[in-house]
Swiss-Prot record:
Keywords: Nucleus, Repeat, Ribonucleoprotein, RNA-binding, rRNA processing
Stored SMART domains: RRM (SM00360), RRM_1 (SM00361)
Protein name, as recorded: Multiple RNA-binding domain-containing protein 1
Top-rank taxon, per record: Eukaryota
Keyword RNA-binding: yes
Species: Candida albicans (strain SC5314 / ATCC MYA-2876) (Yeast)
CDD domains documented for this protein: RRM1_MRD1, RRM3_MRD1
GO molecular function: RNA binding; rRNA primary transcript binding
Biased composition (Basic and acidic residues): 202-213
Similarity comment: Belongs to the RRM MRD1 family.
Compartments, as annotated in UniProt: Nucleus
Signal peptide: none
Pfam family, one: RRM_1
Residues annotated as domain RRM: 2-79, 310-388, 493-565, 617-700, 717-794
Amino acid sequence: MSRLIVKGLPKYYTEEKLREFFSKQGDVTDVKLMKKRNGESRKFAFIGYKSADAAERAVKYFNKSFIDTARIEVEFAKTFSDPTVPLSFKEKRKREEQKLKDEQERLLEQELRAQAKKQKTKSTSEIDDEIASNPKLREYMEVMKPSHQVKSWANDTIADGSGGPSVQDLENALNGNNESPVDKSNIEVVNTVEDASDDEYNDFKELSNKHGENEDEEEEEEMMSLGDLPTNEENKDKNESGENLAANENISDLEWLKSRSTRIKENGEVPEIVPEVKEVNEVTEATQQSDNEPEMTPEEQIAHKIEETGRLFIRNISYEASEEDFRSLFSQYGALEEVHIAIDTRTGKSKGFLYVQFLKKEDATRAYRSLDKQIFQGRLLHILPADKKKDHRLDEFDLKNLPLKKQRELKKKAQAAKTQFSWNSLYMNSDAVLESVASKLGVTKSQLIDPENSSSAVKQALAEAHVIGDVRKYFEDRGVDLTSFDKKERDDKIILVKNFPFGTTIDEIGELFSAYGQLKRMLMPPAGTIAIIEFRDAPSARAAFSKLAYKRFKSSILYLEKGPKDLFTREPTTNEVATIPEQQQNEHAVEAKISANEILGESKEDDEIESVQGPTVAVFVKNLNFATTVQALSDLFKPLPGFVVATVKTKPDPKNSGKTLSMGFGFVEFRTKEQANVAISTLDGHVLDGHKLQLKLSHKQGTGTSASSIKKSGKSSKIIIKNLPFEATRKDLLELFGAFGQLKSVRVPKKFDQSARGFAFVEFNLMKEAETAMSQLEGVHLLGRRLVMQYAEQDAENAEVEIERMTKKVKKQVATQNLAAARLAGKGKIELEEKDEEDFD
């Protein structure tokens, strides 16, 4: 917890005074003094610290202390999600209003249900009464009953005898009684039907229509009482006329179609189509369904939108926070695609908000639910859903219409920021290297490289090694840590610019990159083969990288690579940001040079350390700060003579597996007892990270191998060269490595067809010569391939050691083959023996 609440403050205290008062124990990121509506102080405030350790120290230091004459109480602040936080008066009133509203809605719903039930019962009874009072309607309802509700053996009469002729009426009709209510026309119809033939069918139809017209009209009038909608007379007439035309055999299909079609003039208006009118019951049901759906709470609406985009908008962040701080915070919930802090382009400072894009949308939802309104670096994070990022890239449909060369160029640009380059960080254009060396020697490039000479490739490799050495020396003098190039983590603010033509000036590079933001540092060695650009802020550097990657520049194409983290060991000087070539050339005369061995960790002292034989003298260092690292302790004792190594004792962290905690003490080893006593007299009582150190001689002796044995263990006078061109010969290796010392042997293994296998072994007489060759030829290209060099194992001194080594090697090869076979067959896994063994002898 990095946020505190301070109670009992004086009324006249302001936020500026609070910030000044509480900054004694750490960096204060936020000060919030609570006030009333009239601006009067409520005598409590919230203080935010950048780290939880600083907040903890502040609680111990300031709690129950005094500000002027007021005694203050300092405690850790609670988050909104803490169940122990009491509700405010506003929140209580809001909940009571919501409860009352829910109760009113429940009562209203019950009333509506009762009315609907009553209305349904009333309408059912009205229909039953109407059927009982109307014989014709009752007969119709009986006839229209489904077959499973009608008894097939029952008489076709109405239950109460009404609605049909009685037995007396039928007898009178058969006897020809004129008083019968049955119309004579009905009898004529029956007789006609019995004696009719097929030719007289039309007459019978006309006769039946005459008797049926009045009945249909009466039935329609009776059915109107059910509330049916009135029919459209015009549509009825049109349908009847269409049916008559269809029944007429003399009308063709085309004439019938014309009669059913409507002609529209060329410039006439299209008649509006009347939408279908829904039933009243259907509309009511749809309305009821929408009312029954539960409304989403504001939190659920935010989570639903986050699930659609997978992007978060976080505000109220600390202005000193970096993208790496939030990357480590949000990466706990899933893989991140982008973390972007909004930067003010005029000042280069944060605007106080950022965007986080997750690869998986569900991870963004989990991060929102976990971190919203939580404390980070002393501030309450407010997380909202962000709109989807605008993508201006071309899709596959647009790309396929472009030429193939343009498609590849655009795809390279899109993948530039994600691709890990295969070349080394100090890659240089071979043509620029030769131009630089030729210019330095005062000869032409053709004179330097003779195309008819078989050793031209070796000369080019040696020239590249010379230029790389000069570049290393230049960068080391400017505070560049070359060992950081081996790190995997990259810094978005640093860009390595490569492959530009020889003769390019620092002004041209600066003008090219300054269009995307303010530059903090520019370095380009006199060889003019590579440059390092550092931007003031990361967004500007990302924009420049995406726009300039693989961009054609003069006669070449720019290769850009993001620089490693912690590349620079110091802040830039005024000369390092200058763009005038004269200042660049005179830089080395102004600045104090730093030894290359110091940057690489191979200083003269290290050479002396390697020569230490036997036990060393250890100094016990007590009362270390738990935050003090080995590097900080080493930096303190390194200037003293005889320093060997410094260590801080640690123990496993029970809360975080894989991490360690400092035990508050350590040891520093020196070569002699006199040098250890000098260190004690010099630094005893020195304050490091806020703690006063206590030094005394340790009763145990140092091993003397903690620093030197690590360096010596992997070194030998034999080097293995990998990624060797197949065209390279033994003569080329003799010329290349012979420039750095006397060679003992050079071996290039070959296949059965006498072709090279792509690696070789070179052995020097002295280990120092092998180290020189390794350092000078690192990153050098031979025939277009970068040489990868490692120290090889020394040859066995006797046959038994050689047999044991070969046995281990064969076991490893057999285990590898078994593992491959098991994977293909799907039988499982075979664990390899994890031992420190070399692939090559």
